[in-house]
Amino acid sequence: ACDTSDIRLSRDIFAVATDPDIDILVELIGGIETARELVLTAIKNGKHVVTANKALIAEHGNEIFQAAQDNGVDVAFEASVAGGIPILKSLGEGLAANHVNWLAGIINGTGNFILTEMEEGGRAFDDVLAEAQALGYAEADPTFDVEGIDAAHKLTILASIAFGIPLQFSKVYTEGISRITTEDVASAAHFGYRIKHLGIAKDTGNGIELRVHPTLIPKETMLSAVNGVMNAIMIDGDAVGPTLFYGAGAGAEPTASAVVADIIELGRALTVDHDERVPY
């Protein structure tokens, strides 16, 4: 068992952000304004930050990153997109030698669960949404999931890393799935397609196109085979071609996996002994 006897507890989050004995602050409280104030306070007090807060990064990341640069600290946010899939590190490091032509992904598990059940069970949107809420996949207010806002937050972050552009959440064309009917899904299937709710970012040559909307995908493509609450992101690079990343995009354990990975990476960077950084 893990010994937790020396762990200090505090009811004051800002006391944590200003404590000189703390090197890394991990923000998992959600929301935007309080989280923004907490993160900026930690940064201004010389602390590295780990967060899973996609809304915070998508809407205030430019300000946060500038503050981090000014104060010589890092902000890690792998868990903000696609849960346990290490997509941000893959884009920023593993595919760094590529020019990304486009990326497209199923990046909201709730919406994908709803569309999958509508197709496979012939069920109405409202019926499946109620089940998703009962299973804990959707919130009591499902607006962010079914109207594409959650996916737009994630796409904003993906595009920033893929194309080296500032975060531009306000410029994402966003359309949800709440108007999709059982008849729509059946008609798509009749013609050899599936309806998937995609986040798409594309280098058009004249700029970066950012959009989230329901999309007809041929059944024989890899993205069309992604069912339930799973996530998948396909990235087309000039050197590697189309590359698919697939896995659990949400949930406590996949998210925790990404958060802890960021903590470990920052911890290694704080270690002066190079021997601690070898991969074995």
Which role does the model predict for each range below?
Residues 1-45:
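N-terminal glycine-/serine-/threonine-rich beta1-alpha1-beta2 phosphate-ribose binding loop
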Residues 8-11, 20, 59, 82, ...:
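Conserved active-site and cofactor/substrate-binding residues in soluble primary-metabolism enzymes
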Residues 9-10, 18, 26-27, 49-52, ...:
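General beta-strand structural signal in soluble alpha/beta enzymes
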Residues 14, 40, 65, 88-92, ...:
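Predominant activation on well-ordered alpha-helical scaffold segments within soluble catalytic domains
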Residues 29-45, 52-94:
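Rossmann-fold NAD(P)-binding glycine/threonine-rich loop
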Residues 69-150, 157:
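Rossmann-like NAD(P)H-binding beta-loop-alpha module
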Residues 128-225, 230-232:
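Substrate-binding/catalytic subdomain of NAD(P)-dependent oxidoreductase enzymes
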Residues 221-280:
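ATP-dependent carboxylate/acyl-activation modules
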